[in-house]
Structures are given as structure tokens and as C-alpha cells.
From Swiss-Prot:
Record HAMAP family: Ribosomal_bL21
PANTHER family: 50S RIBOSOMAL PROTEIN L21 (PTHR21349), LARGE RIBOSOMAL SUBUNIT PROTEIN BL21M (PTHR21349:SF0)
Function, in words: This protein binds to 23S rRNA in the presence of protein L20.
Assigned keywords, A-Z: Ribonucleoprotein, Ribosomal protein, RNA-binding, rRNA-binding
GO molecular function: rRNA binding; structural constituent of ribosome
Gene that produces this protein: rplU
SUPFAM superfamilies, per database record: L21p-like
Name by which UniProt lists this protein: Large ribosomal subunit protein bL21
């Protein structure tokens, strides 16, 4: 069985025991988190979400992602700007589904 959850402005297709990297959640390592915004659960599709459905997970770690380089340039103007960014992420293991 699988579910589609929405968190951090993105959608993830998950199954039990999957490990996913999502946008940072304010939770400590080992904490249990619940995702209430379930868009699909098995054959059931929500409009836009499924009322009463929840997906639970366990926080494995908090970390920063790979560096993304932003480079801006204007030709013939000697204008060059280089900037780097590392996003804060949370690694979560999906432990179960509840609801429909």
C-alpha cells in the first residue's frame, strides 16, 4: 500500500518503511511526526485531501542538503555574482498509515 502526502509545498509518494528527505520539520531525532495532508491512500483519492487519514513517521536526522550554486552574469558588463545555498532537510522513516 502507498500514500501520497503533502509537506513543505511538495508531494511525496511513500510506502511503509520508506526513508524520505523533506523540508525541515521542527522535531527532534527519534520523535514521531504525523502528516495530516494525505492526498491519496491506496486506491482512495482525496478531493483534495482524505478526511481522517494520517501517515506517521519517525525523524531519523536533521541535516543540510548539497550546496546549490547560483551564478549571475551580465555579458560585456564585468558583472558576475556567485552565491551558494544549502537547504535544511529532515530525514523521516514512514512507519504506518491510519484512516481509510
Amino acid at each position: 500500500m502507498f500514500a501520497v502526502i503533502k509537506t513543505g509545498g511538495k508531494q511525496y509518494k511513500v510506502a511503509e518503511n520508506d526513508v524520505i528527505d523533506i523540508e525541515k520539520l521542527e522535531a527532534d531525532e527519534g520523535a514521531t511526526v504525523e502528516f495530516d495532508s494525505v492526498l491519496a491512500l491506496g486506491d482512495t483519492v482525496g478531493l483534495p485531501t482524505i478526511a481522517g487519514a494520517k501517515v506517521t513517521g519517525e525523524v531519523l536526522s536533521q541535516f543540510r542538503g548539497e550546496k546549490v550554486i547560483i551564478f549571475k552574469k551580465h555579458r560585456r558588463q564585468n558583472y558576475r555574482r556567485k552565491n551558494g545555498h544549502r537547504q535544511f532537510l529532515t530525514r523521516v522513516r514512514i512507519t504506518g498509515f491510519a484512516g481509510v
